[in-house]
């Protein structure tokens, strides 16, 4: 045995000894007390108290194992001869796609606003009320991050460390919110798994990266800009377009407008001529009613209405903090943010009869956070292409034209043939069976699916539930925006238990089913998206892939010149005709490649469920997206099929 082998054996034996001599951890199926610490802060900030949870927690199955009363039970004495370990602490962050609750909130406001007496509230309009309710969703996420997640994320820590934010935090903690919003917030309550209680699921923006998430996390500021547009003296017919043209944020050198974030405005340039187009996707169609000509006409006649003095923030990758932007905590926006919260809270208390606040809600617990929607590829409701100032009335756009600008669902690009591999034609020089180049090889049969309005706006969805198969339990799931949108991942691997590995590691295999987002294509960074489809699942539902020796790597053999016998290459399929225009490899790993970094980000995935591997600001090398939760909860989980929210909830 080599010295390396003996060292490894000693380490394993020492690890087993340490586990055996430590106090055994008894794991039960009943959640431990979830009251949490009084504060999760080192700055002394107070924040919401932690009331006793009043949501039922998961309990053991009715089919509990029988008691140890067998013939040899006393001699075997398992309680004294079994080592237990509940695993290491692990935080799974949940980032809702807030377009979906925003869609529902907008419809709620549209259907009810005319019943309210709003003239005496100068900051209240349909747009500002929608913005307020969306703001409270982001405020709830922050409060859970700051006072329930332990440790709090780096983004939350930056805010918690400054007393300048305390007045605003207190204001939104005590602001009044209608009961309707709690139907959505209840699906964001924290949860610990029953058996694996060291795994905690918390709603948090601690993993958010601007180029991956910005258009899916709706900024309340866009509704303040819509409110301002309603009282402008511009022509009614251009009010909606002027709102789409409004600047929301400067990110690095990019000017991001409302039209970028909701996909309602794009442009096409030919020579020196630039033409703007408006296009109403399902999201923009809902929001357009907040700033259309009819709404503009109604509120322009109000005797008392005030403009929000919103200052456009400028950030870059190093300074962007989603909580600062979404909660409008910039120094030059704090006063107007306080006025906004207090005015809309008073309105909700008086007109909507709201009596509940976030302060008393964040410490509750529910397994509903693990329910989500699973989607296939969908057309974006945004684009990151530049928008010039709108100077003339726009033209009517369409789906195909918008997808070209958004670079979604593009056809296969032409092979430029700009690089030629060397190919030794002398058969005595090389064994061609082991050479990866084909002379005059055939073209690939792989072809991407191009953008299709019906397929990519009205495709069916799946509802995932790890605990139940009751369809009515998913009413709030479809509103919540908790989703996994997967375009090209066809399967994930599961690291199998190994008795020679420490028990703590074995019971902490929580990253199974996740993808390091260094491998994922950013959606808001002008990347071309080609939808090479997954293979049909007909006749292969029982298919499996088994990885030997090391599941963290994919081995491509590099043989010595002199070998024991001629090797047989099997258990793989040739991907014929690779030419740089089609995928050449169909595997990505979190491990650093021994052959250099990945040439491209080819995974097309967005997931609400993430993990950040350290306590610093997130980066593409520390954030993992979960492409499935089945490797955490098992395939016993329930799957149901349903339609999109914009098909289920009609606009009034």
Swiss-Prot record:
Low complexity bias (residue ranges):
34-47
Start-end of Polar residues biased regions: 1-11
Region listing for Disordered, in residue ranges: 1-70
Its cellular-component GO annotations read: viral capsid
Cysteines paired by S-S bonds? none
Keyword Methyltransferase recorded: no
Subcellular localization, as worded in the UniProt entry? Virion
Membrane-spanning regions, if any?
A: none
Q: Where is the signal peptide?
A: none
Query: Which UniProt key words apply to this protein?
Result: Capsid protein, Virion
Primary location group = virion
Q: What does this protein do?
A: The capsid protein self-assembles to form an icosahedral capsid with a T=2 symmetry made of 120 subunits.
Return the protein name.
Capsid protein
Q: Which organism is it from?
A: Atkinsonella hypoxylon virus (isolate 2H) (AhV)
């Amino acid at each position: 045995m080599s010295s390396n082998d003996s060292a490894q054996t000693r380490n394993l034996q020492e690890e087993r000894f340490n586990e055996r001599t430590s106090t055994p951890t008894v794991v039960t199926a009943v959640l431990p007390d979830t009251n949490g610490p009084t504060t999760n802060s080192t700055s002394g900030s107070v924040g919401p108290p932690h009331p006793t949870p009043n949501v039922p927690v998961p309990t053991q199955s009715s089919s509990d194992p029988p008691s140890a009363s067998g013939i040899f039970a006393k001699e075997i004495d398992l309680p004294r001869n079994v080592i237990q370990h509940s695993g290491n602490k692990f935080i799974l962050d949940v980032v809702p796609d807030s377009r979906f609750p925003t869609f529902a909130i907008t419809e709620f406001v549209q259907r009810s606003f005319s019943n309210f007496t709003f003239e005496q509230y100068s900051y209240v309009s349909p747009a500002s009320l929608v913005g307020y309710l969306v703001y409270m969703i982001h405020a709830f996420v922050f409060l859970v991050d700051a006072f329930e997640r332990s440790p709090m994320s780096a983004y939350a820590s930056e805010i918690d460390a400054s007393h300048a934010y305390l007045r605003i935090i207190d204001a939104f903690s005590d602001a009044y919110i209608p009961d309707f919003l709690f139907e959505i917030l209840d699906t964001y309550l924290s949860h610990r798994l029953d058996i694996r209680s060291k795994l905690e699921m918390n709603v948090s923006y601690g993993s958010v990266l601007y180029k991956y998430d910005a258009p899916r996390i709706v900024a309340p500021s866009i509704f303040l800009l819509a409110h301002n547009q309603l009282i402008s003296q511009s022509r009614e017919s251009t009010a909606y377009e002027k709102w789409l043209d409004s600047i929301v944020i400067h990110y690095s050198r990019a000017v991001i407008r409302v039209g970028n974030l909701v996909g309602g405005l794009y442009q096409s340039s030919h020579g020196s001529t630039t033409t703007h187009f408006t296009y109403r996707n399902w999201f923009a169609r809902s929001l357009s009613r907040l700033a259309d000509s009819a709404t503009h006409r109604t509120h322009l006649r109000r005797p008392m209405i005030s403009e929000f003095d919103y200052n456009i923030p400028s950030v870059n990758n190093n300074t962007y903090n989603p909580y600062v932007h979404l909660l409008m905590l910039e120094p030059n926006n704090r006063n107007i943010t306080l006025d906004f919260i207090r005015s809309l809270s008073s309105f909700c208390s008086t007109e909507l009869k709201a009596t509940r606040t976030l302060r008393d809600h964040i410490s509750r617990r529910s397994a509903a956070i693990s329910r989500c929607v699973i989607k296939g590829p969908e057309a974006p409701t945004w684009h990151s292409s530049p928008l010039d100032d709108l100077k003339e009335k726009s033209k009517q756009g369409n789906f195909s034209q918008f997808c070209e600008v958004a670079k979604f669902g593009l056809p296969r690009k032409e092979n430029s043939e700009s690089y030629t591999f060397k190919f030794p034609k002398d058969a005595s020089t090389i064994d061609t069976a082991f050479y990866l180049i084909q002379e005059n090889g055939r073209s690939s049969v792989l072809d991407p699916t191009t953008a299709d309005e019906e397929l990519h706006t009205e495709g069916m969805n799946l509802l995932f539930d790890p605990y139940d198969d009751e369809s009515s339990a998913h009413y709030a799931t479809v509103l919540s925006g908790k989703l996994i949108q997967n375009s090209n991942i066809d399967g994930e691997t599961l690291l199998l238990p190994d008795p020679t590995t420490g028990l703590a590691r074995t019971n902490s295999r929580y990253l199974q089913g996740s993808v390091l987002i260094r491998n994922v294509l950013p959606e808001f960074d002008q990347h071309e998206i080609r939808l090479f489809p997954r293979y049909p699942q007909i006749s292969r539902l029982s298919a499996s892939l088994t990885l030997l020796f090391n599941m963290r790597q994919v081995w491509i053999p590099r043989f010595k010149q002199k070998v024991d016998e001629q090797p047989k290459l099997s258990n793989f399929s040739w991907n014929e005709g690779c030419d740089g225009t089609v995928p050449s490899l169909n595997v990505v790993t979190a491990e650093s490649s021994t052959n250099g970094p990945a040439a491209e980000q080819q995974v097309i995935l967005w997931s609400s469920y993430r993990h950040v591997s350290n306590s610093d600001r997130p980066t593409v090398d520390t954030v993992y997206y979960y492409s499935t939760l089945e490797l955490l909860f098992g395939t016993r989980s329930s799957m149901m099929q349903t339609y999109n929210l914009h098909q289920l909830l009609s606009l009034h």
